């Protein structure tokens, strides 16, 4: 009777294995001590014959209770490693037994930290890891999917057949399997069978490398195999706060900065050409650059321009080029479009060698519905909310993370730490923060659910952002955490222990909209809109602001920066120069999008590269020269950055000359007798003797003039500077009598003598 029960149980388990419905394969497979003897059971779909090979003995395994379940009876304890010899259709191969490795990979402490949302290095456990177990090299797979009925590893190793390698379910919804037959470079997915019997093929949420789109499998990849030489950079970065330093950021999209001819293939280190990544929407005969080519071309360009940082639009793996990277499916993998993870590491390493920081756009606010991604991951709403009123951005067609779930927060917070630790990035810009903070964001009445207090705030998202920033600065005190937050949510850049969100910079969206609205107006009408150009100072010290002219302002029919400007070409160039110069002298850190630095004419298009041929024309060279010189001046004059967030650093001289559309102000360093006087003339009218009050007498050297001939201007100016005269104006006893060029900004520095 006992043997009958045992046989029925074995047959039932075998049927479950065949139907991919077994969550505990170790219960039946691998070595077992049964009725005073050792047996090894092996599950080998479509095998004709199976043998168990030890160092000195071979045992034939017999099919029992099911044609694919084989059992070998051993005379002794199988303590040593063994191999399985499998014959299928006349072909024989040998492999190690995945189910002979029974030790748990995810320990009790790891599970506990993950379950409470505090495992900051969870990527070292989750995903696919090249390890050695019982002196055998292989890959340990580990995934969180608590609602799955069963999960299998599928890939080239088993012809993508989920019946071959079922995973073992552990405590906490963790699934594991050691695959001794797999190695670096192997492609895989998780085949997940839901409680309802549906089957999903999912890429690894923690995968370190993924296939090039349109394929979407994950690829086994080594993690810690790169030799960094930026220790001095990292030490210096984390030794003090970065926000009290000059920050000038070049925002860019790697795939549309510069393209290469398909005739010029990238040559690998081994001398072989790399096949171009397919991109049907690019111009015929062109291809994307690789990470090594970007290292060679982009970094010197950014260094020559004088920017302190590069901001990369999302490079985490994403299936659709047209999303610009903002619909992420591979959170722990740099996109394969441009090369390998180590090639991206070398890009960052080289940036640091050249004194350039690297900021990544990070998108924890939503994720796409692609079938291979996080959506409905284990047959349930695991990463997202089940109710679309709080779990979906219908306008974007994406899903919202369930921030109330500890493991989901852990996935995201650890991802933040991962990019800093494994790729040495220096900062993040969090996209669309407002969409996270408000439950009714882009939602009509009746299509959102109030929070527990009846309000529209997303309390769980607030707590997540606070946790993410707290953990980030705990690990990397010199990091930059920049919020793209478009509302008046308070205390975005205040510390979390004060109730703030914990960012250290926030894009000043109000300044950006006011400036663009103002500069699009015909200069004659600007006299009626003076408030647009001055209002930002009234709230400037409520947050740590960064002034940004971003990619969002040069797409979807908005025109690129140059073509937003009114008038003929000369006025467009002059207005552009004036806006950029005013931006560099206004309190706040700086960010501009690629192409603005030389006057790109066409709107940004993700499929096209920049109009580099424009640099053959002097006006465009002039704008680039202006940006170069502004960055150099900015870094050399502490008054332009040292007190960005302190009212002491800025003082109006006159902001009320509406009829002339002229403003003047001072930028000051700490307790020094040197300061800068900035005078802006936002009309095409020239003023030959415009008086501006100054605090003390002395010589004021003209250190910058956006109308200079080097920049394509008319070269009107003040012959190198002006001596202050005794004249009472703007509440000062001294004044400068200046020539103000048309559509220009001039900068003067006080000196004790000429």
Curated annotation (Swiss-Prot):
Q: Which SMART domains match?
A: Aamy
What residues make up the catalytic site?
A: 431 (nucleophile), 484 (proton donor)
| Keyword presence, Cell membrane | no
Tell me the pathway: Glycan biosynthesis; glycogen biosynthesis
Q: Name one Pfam family in it.
A: Alpha-amylase_C
Q: Which UniProt keywords apply?
A: Carbohydrate metabolism, Glycogen biosynthesis, Glycogen metabolism, Glycosyltransferase, Transferase
- Keyword flag Nucleotide-binding: no
Write down the top EC class of this protein.
transferase
GO terms for MF: 1,4-alpha-glucan branching enzyme activity; cation binding; hydrolase activity, hydrolyzing O-glycosyl compounds
Catalysed reaction, written as an equation? Transfers a segment of a (1->4)-alpha-D-glucan chain to a primary hydroxy group in a similar glucan chain
Instruction: For this entry, list what GO says about its biological process.
Output: glycogen biosynthetic process
Q: What is its EC number?
A: 2.4.1.18
- Coiled coil stretches, renumbered: none
Q: Which GO terms describe its cellular component?
A: cytosol
User: What role is this protein assigned?
Assistant: Catalyzes the formation of the alpha-1,6-glucosidic linkages in glycogen by scission of a 1,4-alpha-linked oligosaccharide from growing alpha-1,4-glucan chains and the subsequent attachment of the oligosaccharide to the alpha-1,6 position.
Assembly and interaction partners: Monomer.
Q: Which family does it belong to?
A: Belongs to the glycosyl hydrolase 13 family. GlgB subfamily.
Q: What is this protein called?
A: 1,4-alpha-glucan branching enzyme GlgB
- Classification of source organism: Bacteria, Bacillati, Cyanobacteriota, Cyanophyceae, Synechococcales
């Amino acid at each position: 009777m006992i043997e009958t029960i045992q046989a029925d149980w074995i047959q039932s388990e075998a049927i479950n294995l065949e139907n991919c419905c077994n969550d505990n394969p170790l219960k039946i497979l691998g070595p077992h001590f049964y009725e005073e003897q050792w047996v090894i059971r092996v599950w080998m779909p479509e095998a004709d014959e199976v043998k168990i090979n030890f160092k000195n003995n071979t045992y034939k395994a017999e099919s029992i209770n099911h044609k694919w379940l084989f059992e070998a009876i051993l005379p002794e304890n199988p303590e040593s490693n063994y191999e399985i010899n499998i014959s299928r259709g006349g072909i024989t191969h040998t492999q190690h037994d995945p189910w002979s490795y029974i030790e748990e990979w995810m320990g009790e402490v790891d599970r506990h930290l993950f379950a409470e949302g505090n495992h900051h290095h969870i990527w070292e456990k989750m995903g696919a890891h090249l390890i050695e177990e019982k002196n055998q090299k292989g890959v340990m797979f580990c995934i969180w999917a608590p609602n799955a009925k069963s999960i299998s590893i599928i890939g080239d190793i088993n012809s993508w057949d989920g019946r071959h390698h079922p995973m073992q379910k552990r405590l906490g919804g963790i699934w594991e399997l050691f695959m001794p037959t797999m190695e670096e470079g192997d492609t895989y997915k998780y085949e997940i069978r839901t409680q309802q019997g549906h089957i999903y093929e999912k890429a690894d949420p923690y995968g370190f490398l993924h296939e090039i789109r349109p394929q979407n499998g994950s690829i086994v990849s080594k993690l810690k195999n790169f030799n960094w030489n930026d220790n001095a950079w990292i030490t210096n970065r984390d030794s003090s706060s970065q926000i009290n330093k000059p920050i000038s950021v070049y925002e860019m999209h790697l795939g549309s900065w510069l393209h290469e001819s398909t005739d010029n293939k990238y040559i690998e280190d081994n001398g072989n050409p790399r096949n171009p990544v397919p991109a049907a929407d690019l111009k015929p005969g062109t291809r994307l650059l690789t990470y090594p080519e970007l290292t060679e071309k982009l970094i010197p360009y950014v260094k020559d321009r004088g920017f302190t940082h590069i901001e990369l639009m999302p490079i985490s793996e994403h299936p659709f080029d047209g999303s610009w990277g903002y619909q992420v499916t591979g959170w722990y993998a740099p996109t394969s479009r441009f090369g390998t993870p180590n090639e991206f590491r070398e890009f960052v390493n080289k940036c640091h060698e050249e004194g350039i920081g690297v900021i990544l756009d990070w998108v924890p606010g939503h994720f796409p519905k692609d079938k291979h991604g996080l959506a409905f991951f284990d047959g349930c709403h695991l990463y997202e909310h089940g109710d679309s009123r709080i779990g979906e951005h219908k306008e974007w067609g994406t899903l919202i993370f369930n921030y109330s779930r500890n493991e989901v927060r852990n996935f995201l917070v650890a991802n933040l730490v991962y990019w800093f630790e494994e790729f040495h990035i220096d900062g993040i810009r969090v996209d669309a923060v407002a969409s996270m903070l408000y439950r009714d964001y882009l939602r009509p009445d009746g299509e959102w659910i109030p929070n527990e207090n009846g309000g529209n705030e997303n309390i769980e998202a607030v707590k997540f952002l606070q946790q993410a920033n707290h953990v980030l600065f705990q690990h990397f005190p010199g990091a930059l955490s920049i919020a793209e937050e478009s509302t008046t949510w308070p205390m975005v850049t205040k510390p979390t222990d004060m109730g703030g969100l914990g960012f250290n910079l926030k894009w000043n969206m109000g300044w950006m909209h006011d400036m663009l609205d103002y500069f699009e107006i015909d200069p004659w009408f600007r006299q009626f809109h003076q408030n647009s150009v001055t209002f930002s100072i009234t709230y400037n010290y409520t947050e740590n602001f960064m002034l940004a002219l971003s990619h969002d302002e040069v797409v979807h029919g908005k025109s690129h920066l140059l073509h937003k400007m009114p008038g003929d070409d000369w006025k467009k160039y002059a207005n552009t120069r004036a806006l950029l110069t005013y931006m560099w002298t206004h309190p706040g850190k700086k960010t501009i999008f690629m192409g603005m630095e030389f006057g790109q004419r066409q709107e940004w298009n993700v499929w096209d590269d920049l109009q580099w041929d424009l640099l053959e024309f002097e006006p465009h060279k002039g704008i680039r020269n202006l940006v170069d010189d502004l960055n150099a001046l900015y870094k050399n004059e502490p008054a332009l950055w040292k007190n960005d967030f302190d009212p002491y650093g800025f003082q109006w001289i006159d902001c009320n000359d509406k009829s002339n559309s002229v403003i003047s102000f001072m930028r000051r360093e700490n307790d020094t007798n040197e300061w800068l006087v900035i005078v802006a003339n936002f009309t095409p009218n020239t003023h030959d003797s415009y008086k501006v009050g100054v605090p003390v007498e002395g010589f004021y050297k003209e250190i910058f003039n956006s109308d200079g001939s080097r920049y394509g201007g008319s070269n009107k100016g003040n012959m190198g500077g002006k001596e202050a005269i005794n004249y009472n104006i703007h509440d000062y006893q001294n004044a400068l009598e200046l020539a103000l060029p048309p559509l220009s900004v001039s900068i003067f520095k006080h000196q004790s003598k000429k």
